[in-house]
């Protein structure tokens, strides 16, 4: 679960990095 792009560092209820690894239906786009 690591992300290095934009937004927060993918935690447990805040996924934002859609260009790293964590990209759930949170805030990607």
Swiss-Prot record:
The record marks 15 as: Important for Cav2.1/CACNA1A calcium channel binding. The modification Cysteine amide is found at residue 28. Disulfide bonds join 3-18, 10-22, 17-28. It is found in: Secreted. Expressed by the venom duct. One of its GO terms (molecular function) is calcium channel regulator activity. Not hydroxylated; hydroxylation, on a synthetic hydroxylated MVIIC, has a significant impact on the oxidative folding but not on the biological activity. One of its GO terms (cellular component) is host cell presynaptic membrane. This is Omega-conotoxin MVIIC. It comes from Conus magus.
